[in-house]
Amino acid sequence: MILRTILTFSAVLAVGVASAAHTDAPPGRYDYTAKVAAAGAAGKAAATKSNEPEEALALADRTYAYVAKALGEAALKDEKAELEADRTWLAAAKTERARKTVEKEIRRLRRRILFRHPDLQFKKLLAVQRGIPYSRENHMVDQYLGRWSRPGPGLVVLENWQTAPKKSSLLGGKLPTGTVINPDLHWNADRILFSFCDHTAKPPADAQKLKVPEVIVRDDPWVKKVDPAHPIYGPGYKAGGERAVAHRRYFIYECAADGSWVRQVTGCPGDPMETQGGRQTAMIEDIDPCYLPDGGFVFSSTRGQNYGRCHWGRYVPSFLLYRADAGGKNIRQLSFGEANEWEPAVMNDGRIAYTRWDYINRHAVWFQSLWATRPDGTAVSHVYGNYSEDIGVVTETKAIPGSRLLLCTASAHHNITSGSLFLLDPSVGEDGLKPVTRVTPEVPFPESEGWNTPGAYCSPFPVNDTLFLCPYSDETLGYPDYHPRHRREEYMAAWPSPAAFGIWLVDTLGGRELIYQDPEISTFNPIPLVKRPMPPALVSTLPPPDKAPDTGLCYVENVYDCRSELPKDSIKCLRINKLDVMGACRRETLNQHDDLDLHKESLGTVPVAADGSAQFRIPAGVPIQLQAVDTNGVAVFTMRSFIYAQKGEVQGCTGCHENKFKSGAAKYAVQSPAGRTTYDPKPEVDLGYTGPFSFTKSVQPIFDRHCISCHGLGEGRRPAFSLVGTNGVYNLIKRKQISFVASYRETRESKPYDYFAAASPLWKKVKRGHGGAKLSKEELQTLALWMDLNVTEFTVGGGYSWNRPESRDADPAGETALRAAVREALGEKVAAQPFDALVNRGMEERSRVLWLVKPEDRDRFLRLVKASLKPKPAQDILGTCGRDDACECNSCWIRRGGYNDPKRLQPTKIR
């Protein structure tokens, strides 16, 4: 018998109810016997003490059968004899005390039997020790920024891990104080990739003069003990205030599995530090490195210089997928989303699984789903969760050895990555709970099944399809108030303790065995230090870079092959919309009606053939949305996600959001089908400008010409509301004249004619000539396009920036001069009209006053119109506002500080 005291609890999964087992909790830790939970959404439940010994015996029986299947019963004859003796002992036990004594022995025997399994016979276990990241906002993306990192010992090795784990530092002080996250062990078990944040790196000399977004630093007991000179506590921190750690960031490093060498791979000499579009609006940070079978590696990075739209000006740049050759050479962008795409992992077929946050005209919280791509960035496809709200964040995906199953963590949008574990079978379905098997039903799926529930798993590693190594904490990883800025002290007090997470062995039999719990700091990312089979290396299907066009080719076999039934023969064309990413930290109101709306630019339409097929080109390297458009020029069906193409890529699908389990998997080919004509998008109307659609430039002139004489200027019958200027949009929405997708009030998935022009009373009115207005075909199509793009308002000439021309104020002196000239030319009545009835703030040439004056006076009045508007405060510089000390975009400090300048890099000092 094993006499050592162990900490363990079991869950009886067969009946779907978790129950507590005996526990001897270490001093200062929670008593796990008081923590039990019902499966799924039921959450916590009281322990049933009367049947715990019988449950322990049933678990031991299942464990014996499982291990005996692998080893043979002869190898376990001694354990079988002990199990039968314990069964007899339990039957004879009469008192609760006696039954508890037997239960303890049964659980010890069960642990010993389990550890006999051949897949658990490795000698060493790799892990990471670090503090738990935190920020002023409890959000899933903040944790990956170095500024919020908490230091720790880093990479450690646990020897004798089954019985009495002995911890040792892998790198033995080769790296300075800092934080290691998300290591990846090569299949040959000879080297390790990991992300590291160097806490000894210094900010630029003039950093305190820069307008740097605020950072809050909490007291850290581990740092205080081992590094009292750390900036958290030193005079430098007090002098520098909260900005002292804002420069910290993660880069990628590689080391030998035996710790004999370590090197920096990114953020060091040789890294060109190139960013998308040359923007300099976010510090480059690299995380989530993952080896590829072709010799390179994939990782997530802020090199795309994007931001999510719902962070309210916080410094939270998006991470997108990149790849590099061995040693960090030839870095290339793989994904082009507008929000985060992260946590890449190689599946058994050689493709890369990753998590995508996707809220294109849909809820910003519930859709962090699982996607896959080939290692060259082609053939992007949905794996699970794009239509489902059952699991909010599907992440930390790992392929099960020798299986089609994937091990995933169901995590929360408003928390660090942790939650409940489940197995996913993509062959069963791509949404809902049918393809999901819960591994830890005692922990609810965070947010979708409950908020602030106790217990959380994270960074799991599958030993096989039954056994999983995984950190676990019984603490509540949440905060009392939904928005912590209002009750920050309470929020901070509720944050997990430094040693919240320890390593456990979790199994689908119903058992939970503690492997290692450090009393001072949390332990994450357990990985057996053994070789594993390498997945196949997928050869790139792309043309050589010097021969690749700047476009990709897409084809659709049949737009009518759809989850929702589309009206027969209704689709005339596909509209190709380019999604405009938010390239800076700070932005003003995006739209009056929806502050989280995404800006879009219609590139034009491509025809759909009679058989429902279409083949067309799209620009490479940008996110694209598709809309199926009918013969009236209005959207029938709208994609609420996006596609993108690599240069020279050929990609295809069966239909519009087709069910691949009904129609077969989405097609992928190196060449397009023969005999089809390939079209380039043709603009529906000539907007007269490039970039995202602008209400002020395109729709206001239509209202000015046909509507405001009644709706705003008081001519004829007094109207119920005004359409003068952008207030007209608000008035139309208030009176439910236009149908749009409002953030946090969206339907879960697209349906035919559900929103936009076709569902808007305004569209029906202008079509039938409301009020005698006779709009041209081009004007009608412009209105339809505006509504189909979700009633976009402010975009062009700065996009999400505060620096857009549509937001320019009137210049008092210039307005006075303009009105004087109007009074002389057109009379007092016109001169007294609202400023927005005379001047178009976004495009002066389309100002209404220019239509009213004589042709020979237009040039003079155009000069007066331009003088009546204040100039934009500044011109953008590499994506920033360029105002430096008077910065309004919260990003100028990146450029001024030279954070992405390869000549100013500070490589980590490796000993």
Segments the model singles out, each with a brief description of its role:
Residues 355, 395-504:
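Loop/turn-rich, solvent-exposed surfaces of beta-rich toroidal or solenoidal domains
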Residues 123, 127-150, 195-251, 275-277, ...:
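Short, conserved, GDST-rich strand-edge loop motifs in beta-rich repeat architectures
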Residues 126, 184, 290, 335, ...:
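Conserved beta-strand position repeated across blades of beta-propeller domains
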Residues 120-121, 187-188, 292-294, 347-349, ...:
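Residue-level detector of Asp-centered blade-edge/turn motifs that repeat once per structural unit
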Residues 163-178, 257-283, 325-339, 374-393, ...:
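Multi-bladed beta-propeller domains
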Residues 154-156, 251-253, 320-322, 369-371, ...:
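A short loop-to-beta-strand structural motif that recurs across blades of beta-propeller domains
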Residues 21-44, 48-51, 62, 83-108, ...:
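Aromatic- and Gly/Pro-enriched helix-to-coil junctions and flexible linker segments
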Residues 121, 151, 179-181, 188, ...:
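Beta-rich catalytic cores
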